[in-house]
Amino acid sequence: MAVTDIFARRATLARSVRLLSQFRYERSEPARFYGALAADTAAMVDDLWRAGHGESAAGRTLLDVGGGPGYFAAAFTDAGVRYLGVEPDPGEMHAAGPVVAADTGTFVRASGMALPFADDSVDICLSSNVAEHVPRPWQLGAEMLRVTRPGGLAVLSYTVWLGPFGGHEMGLTHYLGGARAAERYARKHGHPAKNNYGSSLFEVSVADGLAWAASTGAALAAFPRYHPRWAWSLTSVPVLREFLVSNLVLVLQPQ
């Protein structure tokens, strides 16, 4: 069984529409948006684990690189997974306030590019929408592989720069160029974007991600995170994939 076989059954058009419809609530109702994304991600990771290991990920240890304020912690804890979260920004770690229970995992303040964990120390290492926010995304990926036990899973998902969501809060102006989009945003709002091009937002392509994954010798699968199964073949079409694969998932297994 391929690692994506179980998840592929759930990757329907209805799921895609449901997830994408939540994006409009990212700023106005973050609990609604991130709660839905976290629940879907926990289910996706469990599907990937189940396909490769024949059992649920419940009871396994998962390290979430860039876990944020705790919505993912709650979703994985509810699924029976032992959750460890890494977040470099203390503001993000506490942003959820009282919505996250005290017993939903362990959190560490650290950089994803220098994880403070031993080699082969977790069963699953996840990074969701973080790689585009660090200057060296494949160093982050290498760290994820380092801490994942042989036979475990590293799941690296990131927003593709040339996709429709690549500019984050800058909207589609990123197609004018990152620096110009950042200038336009600052001029309009009177302050830089939270995801500011060149400091907290960087260009990451599908091609670069696929090339890096292939170079590790650990790649199992690559697919568009929010697309229905019948659209996954877009990942293999050069140029077009950069615009139509809005978020790429790389699944790797250290040996």
UniProtKB/Swiss-Prot annotation:
Source superkingdom: Bacteria
Q: Which GO terms describe its molecular function?
A: S-adenosylmethionine-dependent methyltransferase activity
Q: Which UniProt keywords apply?
A: Methyltransferase, Transferase
Offer one example of a GO biological process linked to this entry: methylation
What CDD domains does the entry give? Answer: AdoMet_MTases
This entry's Enzyme Commission designation comes to 2.1.1.-
Family annotation (InterPro entries): Methyltransf_11, SAM-dependent_MTases_sf
- What is the uppermost EC class here? transferase
Keyword Methyltransferase assigned: yes
- Keyword presence, RNA-binding: no
**Which family would the database say this protein is a member of?**
Belongs to the methyltransferase superfamily.
Protein name (database record): Uncharacterized methyltransferase MAP_3663c
